[in-house]
C-alpha cells in the first residue's frame, strides 16, 4: 500500500493532484549525494556526478539525496510513499560524497550542469557557514537563467539576533527554507535569520532510502524538497510563469506562523500559490 507522508498534505499538494497537476514536464535537479535510481518508488531521468571519487550519480552512499528525491517525486503507485510532484522529472546531480561532504567547486559544477541542461527547479539540501564569490555567481546565474532555486536554511538553530542561515541559502537569489513539525512549530534545529524565506515540514519526514527501503529523517534538508516539489507543481499548472512569479506566489500565499526571523513568510501553501 502507498502512504501519504504528513508533509505532502500539510503543504496542500493533494489538492493540486486532484486537479490533475502532478509536476509533468518539469525538470528538477537534486544537487546532493546522488539518487539510488534502482528504487522502485523513484524514476530518475538523468544526471551527472561531480565527485571525483564517486562517478556514478545513480548510487547514493549517504542516503541523503535519495531521501530528498522521494519527497519531491516519489511515484504515485501502490507502494511506499507519495512525493509532492510525483510526475516531475528527477535528475541526480552528485556533488556530495558518501560521507555527505563536498567541495564548493563540485557544487558549482553541479549548478552549471543544471543550467546547461535546462533544469526548471534546483533543490540544494546542503550548505555551509561560509560562502564563496564563485558560488554566489553561479547561483545568481541559475536564477537569472530562469531556474527556481530552493536551498536549506541550515540546522544551526537560533543564536540571539545573529543569523544562522548557511550558504547558499543566505544568498538573496535563493529561496531559503526552514523546517516546521506537523503542528507548524519551528523545529528547534532550524536556522534563523532575516534571509529565511519560507517554512516547510522537516521533522520525521518519511521518504525513500537506498536499497528500495524507506525511513524518517529530520532537517531543513527535508523541508527544502517540499518547496522544490511545490515549485514543480505550480509550473505544471502554469508553465508560462517565470521563476520570480513562482517564488513570489509561494511567499505571498504562505501561512503566517510568527516572526519572519524565525519563520520567514510562513508555511508554504501550494494550493493557494498555484491559484
Curated annotation (Swiss-Prot):
Listed EC numbers: 3.4.21.62
Origin superkingdom: Bacteria
Domain Peptidase S8: 5-274
Gene3D superfamilies xref list: Peptidase S8/S53 domain (3.40.50.200)
Keyword Lyase carried by entry: no
Localisation: Secreted
Matching CDD domains: Peptidases_S8_Subtilisin_subset
Reactions this protein catalyses: Hydrolysis of proteins with broad specificity for peptide bonds, and a preference for a large uncharged residue in P1. Hydrolyzes peptide amides
Cofactor(s) essential for the protein: Ca(2+)
MF terms (GO), sorted A to Z: metal ion binding; serine-type endopeptidase activity
Catalytic residues of the enzyme: 32 (charge relay system), 64 (charge relay system), 221 (charge relay system)
GO-annotated cellular components: extracellular region
Keyword line: Calcium, Hydrolase, Metal-binding, Protease, Secreted, Serine protease, Sporulation
Cofactor stoichiometry and binding remark: Binds 2 calcium ions per subunit.
Binding site for Ca(2+) 2: 169, 171, 174
Disulfide bonds: none
Enzyme class, UniProt record, top EC level: hydrolase
Function per UniProt: Subtilisin is an extracellular alkaline serine protease, it catalyzes the hydrolysis of proteins and peptide amides.
Family listed: Belongs to the peptidase S8 family.
Protein name per the record: Subtilisin
Lineage, highest ranks first: Bacteria, Bacillati, Bacillota, Bacilli, Bacillales
Amino acid at each position: 500500500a502507498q502512504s501519504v507522508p504528513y508533509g505532502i498534505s500539510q503543504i496542500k499538494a493533494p489538492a493540486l493532484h486532484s486537479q490533475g497537476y502532478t509536476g509533468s514536464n518539469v525538470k528538477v535537479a537534486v544537487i546532493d549525494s546522488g539518487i539510488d535510481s534502482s528504487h522502485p518508488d523513484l524514476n530518475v531521468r538523468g544526471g551527472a556526478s561531480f565527485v571525483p571519487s564517486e562517478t556514478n550519480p545513480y548510487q547514493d552512499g549517504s542516503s541523503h539525496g535519495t531521501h530528498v528525491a522521494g519527497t519531491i517525486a516519489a511515484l504515485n503507485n501502490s507502494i511506499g510513499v507519495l512525493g509532492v510532484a510525483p510526475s516531475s522529472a528527477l535528475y541526480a546531480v552528485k556533488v556530495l560524497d558518501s560521507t555527505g561532504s563536498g567541495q564548493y567547486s563540485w557544487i558549482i559544477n553541479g549548478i552549471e550542469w543544471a543550467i546547461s541542461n535546462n533544469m526548471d527547479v534546483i533543490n540544494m539540501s546542503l550548505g555551509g557557514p561560509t560562502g564563496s564569490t564563485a558560488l554566489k555567481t553561479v547561483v545568481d546565474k541559475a536564477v537569472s537563467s530562469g531556474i527556481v532555486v530552493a536551498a536549506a536554511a541550515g540546522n544551526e538553530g537560533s543564536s540571539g539576533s545573529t543569523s544562522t542561515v548557511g550558504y547558499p541559502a543566505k544568498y538573496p537569489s535563493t529561496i531559503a527554507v526552514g523546517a516546521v513539525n506537523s503542528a507548524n512549530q519551528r523545529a528547534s534545529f532550524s536556522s534563523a535569520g532575516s534571509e529565511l524565506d519560507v517554512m516547510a515540514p522537516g521533522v520525521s519526514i518519511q521518504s525513500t532510502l537506498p536499497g528500495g527501503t524507506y525511513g524518517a529523517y529530520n532537517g531543513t534538508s527535508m523541508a527544502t524538497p517540499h518547496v522544490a516539489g511545490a515549485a514543480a507543481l505550480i509550473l505544471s499548472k502554469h508553465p508560462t510563469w517565470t521563476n520570480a512569479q513562482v517564488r513570489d506566489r509561494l511567499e505571498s500565499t504562505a501561512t503566517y506562523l510568527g516572526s519572519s526571523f524565525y519563520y520567514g513568510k510562513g508555511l508554504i501553501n501550494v494550493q493557494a500559490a498555484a491559484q
